[in-house]
């Protein structure tokens, strides 16, 4: 297994999946969950301390390989942002490996994002390789309005800077997602699912949450005063919601 991972605590396995960051994204939540569970946090391929790939990247199959390597037959997945997208795809393709599913402001394969979102992403990409400018543009998005004025701003900037440096190292590979996309299969989710999102997150991410509300049996919880980085700014709230859900 060449992916970087950390394991803390004992009990039922809980696997944490991040998006555009690294295991530091879970610093506060992981420490709380490790009181009661075996917590596995890992860096996706090409991020954090995990190696890049010379071939197309399939995060779903990477997760399967990690679970097999750790001899985890069944786990609860907690995914943030794109990590939530990966967790959803995994739950649809390997339902027997999932006990419960927790999604924090998740992405969704096949979802049509707004023109405004696409234009913002284009501006960020056009600013490359000026990492400071890319970070400035990204954090100017309203979905980061809470974390940027919190004590966790510096951690956020550090993770983004490291992530973007890693991105420039990637060879020309693409991400492989299962087909058909999850948006067409949400009704097939069998794992009991909790979706948590900050009320100050972006309109697009709130639309994703609403899509889950309409097309799956997921329980939706909106947290007041939280943005896209609810895992950094509201770890105690997440801990209470997640542990309550897992005890059901």
Predicted feature descriptions by range:
Residues 3-49:
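Conserved HGGG/HGGXW glycine-rich cap/lid loop of the alpha/beta-hydrolase fold
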Residues 79, 83, 87:
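Gly/Ala-rich beta-loop-alpha elbow adjacent to hydrolase catalytic centers
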Residues 43-48, 107, 226-227:
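Short beta-to-alpha linker loops that shape the active-site pocket of alpha/beta-hydrolase fold enzymes
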Residues 226-235, 239:
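Catalytic histidine-centered segment of alpha/beta-hydrolase-like enzymes
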């Amino acid at each position: 297994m060449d992916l970087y991972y950390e394991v803390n605590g004992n009990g039922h396995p809980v696997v944490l999946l991040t998006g555009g960051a690294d295991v530091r994204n879970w610093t506060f939540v992981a420490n709380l969950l490790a009181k009661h569970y075996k917590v596995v946090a890992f860096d996706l391929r090409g991020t954090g301390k995990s190696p890049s790939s010379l071939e197309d990247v399939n995060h779903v199959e990477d997760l399967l390989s990690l679970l097999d390597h750790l001899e985890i037959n069944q786990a609860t997945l907690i995914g943030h942002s794109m990590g939530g997208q990966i967790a959803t795809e995994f739950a649809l393709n390997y339902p027997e490996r999932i006990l419960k599913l927790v999604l924090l402001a998740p992405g969704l394969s096949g979802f049509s994002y707004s023109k405004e979102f696409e234009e913002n992403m284009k501006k960020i990409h056009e600013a490359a390789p000026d990492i400071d400018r890319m970070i400035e543009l990204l954090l100017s998005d309203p979905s980061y309005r809470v974390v940027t004025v919190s004590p966790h701003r510096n951690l956020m900037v550090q993770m983004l800077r490291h992530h973007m440096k890693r991105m420039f190292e990637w060879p020309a590979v693409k991400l492989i997602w299962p087909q058909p996309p999850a948006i067409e299969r949400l009704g097939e989710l069998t794992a009991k699912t909790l979706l948590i999102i900050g009320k100050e997150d972006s309109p697009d991410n709130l639309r994703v949450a609403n899509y889950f509300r309409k097309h799956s049996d997921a329980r939706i919880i909106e947290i007041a005063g939280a943005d896209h980085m609810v895992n950094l700014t509201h770890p105690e709230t997440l801990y209470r919601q997640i542990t309550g859900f897992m005890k059901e």
